[in-house]
Amino acid sequence: MSHKTPNSLVGMLKSGRLDIIGAVGGLLAALLMLPLQLLASQVYIQTLPLVLGVASILYLLASRTDSASTIATLTPQAARLLPSLSVVGMAALVGLATFQGGRTLLYYDIAAMTGMMVMAQVFFTDDGEFSPALILTQVVLLGLVVRFTALMTSPGYIGIDVWTHMSNWTAAIYQTQSLQPIADMKYFASPLYHLLVAGAALLFDIGIREALFLSLAIAMPISVLFVYSTTKLLVGVRWAVFASTAYALIGHVVEWGIHLIPTSLGLVFFLAILYSLTRVLHLDYKLRDFVLVVFFSVAVILTHQISAFIMLVFTGAGLLAQFALSFGLFNPRMSSALDFSPQDTVNLSGLIAFDLGLITFMWSLTPYQGGTFLATIFSYLENTISSSAGFLALAGPDGSTGSAAAGPQHGTTLMQEVVKYLDVAGFLLLLLFTIVGSMYILRRENASHATFTGVVATVAMLVFVFGFPLFGIRTFVPGRWFAFLAAPMAVIAALGVAFLVKNLTPRTAVVLLLLFTVAFPTVTALASHGTLDSPPLADTQTRYSYTDAELAATGTIADIQPDNEEAPLHTDHPYQTVFDRREGQPVKAMTVTNGTASTANETIVHRTYQQKGAAYVRDTAGFAYQPSVSQQQACSGTRDVTYSNGDVTMCTTVGSDGGS
């Protein structure tokens, strides 16, 4: 073990080290943020101060020593055995999903253990036995297994938006071999997703569902290699493997691998931009490298509007980082500002101008809700700021979809509280290491254009994810940002982990890595975002896939129920979205008060899941909550059953427009 020389915290502060100032400032900020917990119960308000405080303390502890240390590693026999065991675990996952007809709690337990074995190889394999290719192969295979066992055991599709994109738009494009069916939709100007799936279906002569799985579903787990390639430019190979492994396991990333919509394809292109732009910023790049950045930028713009805006924020962070470094804002006492050639500045400024110009042009021509997409978004933003924005304006009956916070009169159960923290734990663990990595980069000799771009991009994206929603501004759809944000976070986190392992005492480093190895795969495997098809905690986490009987009922009910906007169907969320997006049937959220459907003349569609699962309904104030509603409660009063297939029942009031 190498000798460690303690450094004085006061001395480092007096020397003007920006990283130490940042760590102390982070600790103070965490303390100042604690009173917010008394004002709001939102999960991130409750947890972010703790994460920031712990990260700051870890960095200060590690900064007190200068020389490297070595940690305990696996024996050669164990290092060679773990890859085989992880492959056995993946085979068990396939077998379980096949024989049990879906992903169960046992499945998720084995998935978590498999993730632990992969992560243990990253952290504890000796340099002589460490094989990046072998571990990355396991990461990609595990990603494929997790995603395809979900997709192949779920009838139809998983999620909400996918029903519109596939059942309506892609199907119509496939049949007509033209974009005319979406000429009045916003995706007419961003059709790459629909063209990819329709083109794959035509090329391979298969259905559009199979084409979606064979194209985008395969690309999603493979795209994590962009994170590895990006991180390898900045830090050692071991920590690059860590970045890709952690990113692949995050529930938000798994979500877009099973809920396959334009966001998914936009994420693939964003990861390609992350790698290609980092390469341009970090190396003596050639013209082809910059052309790749432009190519993937155009691809994102032609795929998805939100993804394009996120890409614009990321590239803008690169320009902002360049200005900050060129003006010597880090620590002018230690050295001169970093030098940038005029070509670097012109190229990055030109890229921003090109992306912004193309986005503005495309959005100005994109039809959306009777106007253009650009004008509509600005109108939404202006309306939000003028009417509902305010500090801690976090929730309301119309603030989001069916997963909105329950009203105050309903409260939350213990399991709902557990799930609330379980869903964010994986992201917060990664954020902890990201904060450490950001502080490490703030030290002048560790800063480069590429690494500082990652820090600036992460901070900017966190503002859109947490900052604006804190004031009630949700126009930028913050829920879509997490998988994109996790990519630069994973890169910066890799630098943070490498720093901690090098500078903490071996015992402390091993304890920290062991805790992460056990906790991170467990919480990410059980998180709601990555288990939309079959949640492990079925009575608390909402299922966003459907049984054969539930899907059959939507078609039959659409055939027998007249399309009447004045007398829509009423059912739970998310089941209502299938009627709307797949069948074009007028539908509203079911209102339930005191255990019964509240309005006597509503046509109710009840499914068994409303009693046994975690479906959302509304109360009379418009808040979403998850009561257990039996068929007798839903079809109470004067309603008669007009359709039933054993799992789904439709009941209407005698004399109403309600089928036959």
PLM region spans:
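Extracytoplasmic
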Residues: 68, 269, 479, 495, ...
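Start-transfer (signal-anchor) and selected internal transmembrane alpha helices
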Residues: 2-28, 44-46, 59-149, 351-352
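Membrane-interface transmembrane helices that cradle and orient dolichyl/undecaprenyl
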Residues: 271-288
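Active-site lumenal/periplasmic loops and adjacent helix-entry segments of GT-C-fold
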Residues: 128-268, 479-484
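Internal/C-terminal transmembrane anchor helices
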Residues: 133-139, 348-361, 505-528
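Transmembrane catalytic cores of multi-pass membrane glycosyltransferases
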Residues: 39-41, 159-161, 258-266, 287-291, ...
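Hydrophobic/aromatic-rich transmembrane helices and adjacent perimembrane loops
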Residues: 108-112, 309, 473-502
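Membrane-interface helix-loop-helix junctions at transmembrane boundaries of multi-pass membrane enzymes
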Residues: 284, 333-346, 421-426, 432-461, ...
